[in-house]
Amino acid sequence: MSKRAFNFCAGPAALPEAVLQRAQAELLDWQGRGLSVMEMSHRSDAYVAIAEKAEQDLRDLMAIPSDYKVLFLQGGASQQFAEIPLNLLPEGGVADYVDTGIWSRKSIEEARRFGNVNLAASAKPYDYFAISGQNDWQLSDNAAYLHYASNETIGGLQFDWVPELGDTPLVVDMSSDILSRAIDVSKFGLIYAGAQKNIGPSGLVVVIVRDDLLGKARSSCPTMLDYKIAADNGSMYNTPATFSWYLSGLVFEWLKEQGGVEVMEQRNRAKKELLYGFIDASEFYTNPIAENARSWMNVPFRLADERLDKAFLAGADARGLLNLKGHRSVGGMRASIYNAVGLDAVEALVAYMAEFEKEHG
């Protein structure tokens, strides 16, 4: 096999090589049973054991309290934009939302289809380069919940703090930074994350929801979108995304073997400090995000002359530095440096950036 490339894709994203090797080894014959996980009944004892271990490993990694359910659902994070108000926003009620970029705006637009949304805060006045402090937010007195995205994958804007709301449930989209650093799950009413960034392959969304928020779905909520029904059926009301669930479980095992979320946080800090440090010291590359709001996972940057973008990407591709093109709505470059992207990948990227600057700067 040729050398594996360094994959900076925002999602579907890099997976740990050890996980891919194990999945490859088990692909045709899972633990001597003579069949693939893809061929197993989700009701079989073997698969139920896989699913239960994945959940327990995630609980261990995140220290999830016992009064929270962990759901492995379908539809991706985008389906949660509707599922959350259908389950948590009563008819005639209001939900607070914070706008920090494209993904939080999508969640706001979807929630407005189901009820009243109060825009509690927006990064728009800062051109989405900074996040206002909570003292400047316009919170509702009786919000059913407050929703925000902890990390904006496209814009590279990340909260480095957790809102304090008293009794109002805090709902957070952690699709691109879950498991990247330690958090206190008990501060949140509901956490959700699409799998294809820091958890596993696409086709799966993980929802961590506090027990007291179950059973509140509207009568119009489809059965498949009701959290309580999902919880009561062990995330298997219908056939789940079995292979994605299995692979995510392998990632959780790998994370535990690496030392857990605390070790990931140390590694991720080193990666982001190296990359941002190089960008800030350069007169050729720029990142406009306020320092206290810079994403650890998704680092957008621009070249001094956008006419050089194609040459930069071609050179990166030739060196096995893949998927650095920025999102079409933002332009420029973006390096996504999730848990599975090692420090060696960031070192290789910085070396190339220095070489390109020397040649074209």
From Swiss-Prot:
What is this enzyme's catalytic activity, as reactions? Answer: O-phospho-L-serine + 2-oxoglutarate = 3-phosphooxypyruvate + L-glutamate; 4-(phosphooxy)-L-threonine + 2-oxoglutarate = (R)-3-hydroxy-2-oxo-4-phosphooxybutanoate + L-glutamate
Sites binding pyridoxal 5'-phosphate sit at 77-78, 103, 153, 173, 196, 238-239
Q: Which UniProt keywords apply?
A: Amino-acid biosynthesis, Aminotransferase, Cytoplasm, Pyridoxal phosphate, Pyridoxine biosynthesis, Serine biosynthesis, Transferase
Residues binding L-glutamate:
43
- Cofactor binding annotation: Binds 1 pyridoxal phosphate per subunit.
Give the sites modified to N6-(pyridoxal phosphate)lysine.
Answer: 197
Compartments annotated for it: namely:
Cytoplasm
Q: Which Pfam families match?
A: Aminotran_5 (PF00266)
Look up the record and name the cofactor or cofactors this protein needs: pyridoxal 5'-phosphate
One GO BP on record is: L-serine biosynthetic process
Recorded hits in CDD domains, A to Z, give:
PSAT_like (cd00611)
Name the Enzyme Commission number(s) assigned to this protein.
2.6.1.52
| Gene Ontology molecular-function annotations | O-phospho-L-serine:2-oxoglutarate aminotransferase activity; pyridoxal phosphate binding
The yes or no answer to whether the keyword Amino-acid biosynthesis is present is: yes
Q: Which GO terms describe its cellular component?
A: cytoplasm
Domain of life of the organism encoding this protein: Bacteria
In its keyword annotation, does this UniProt entry include Transferase? yes
Q: In which pathway does it act?
A: Amino-acid biosynthesis; L-serine biosynthesis; L-serine from 3-phospho-D-glycerate: step 2/3; Cofactor biosynthesis; pyridoxine 5'-phosphate biosynthesis; pyridoxine 5'-phosphate from D-erythrose 4-phosphate: step 3/5
The UniProt function text for this chain reads: Catalyzes the reversible conversion of 3-phosphohydroxypyruvate to phosphoserine and of 3-hydroxy-2-oxo-4-phosphonooxybutanoate to phosphohydroxythreonine.
NCBIfam families per UniProt: PRK05355.1, serC_1
Give the multimer and partner information.
Answer: Homodimer.
Name the family: Belongs to the class-V pyridoxal-phosphate-dependent aminotransferase family. SerC subfamily.
According to UniProt, the name of this protein is Phosphoserine aminotransferase
**Source organism lineage?**
Bacteria, Pseudomonadati, Pseudomonadota, Gammaproteobacteria, Pseudomonadales
